[in-house]
C-alpha cells in the first residue's frame, strides 16, 4: 500500500508499505520515495539522506538509501517486536536549509502504525490504512 505524495514545503514523499506474513504480520518493509522540488539545490538530497540514515540507525531500524533521478529512495525493515509509526518521516525544505524529523508519538492515531509485539491481522490493518488515505493493493 502507498500514500499518495504531494509537494509540501518543497518535498514530495510517498510511502509503500509491505506487510509480511500470511494472516498475522511478522515484519514490515517500507519504501519511502522523497522528491525534492526542482527549485532547490540537489545537494539537499544528500543532506536529507545523511540525516535519514542517522535517524533510523539511532532507532535500530534497518535502513538503506540511494539517490537516483533527483529522488531519494529509503528502504526500511521493521522486524523487532515493538510499536512503530510507518510514515514517521517529516521533512521540511526551505531556502534556509533542511529539517528532518522522525515522529515518535501518534497520540491522535493519525499515522500508519503497527505494533509487531501483537498479532496483527493483515485485513484489519489494510482497512485501518485505507481510512488514513493510503492506497492499498
Feature locations, PLM:
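Subset-of-secretome marker
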Residues: 1-137
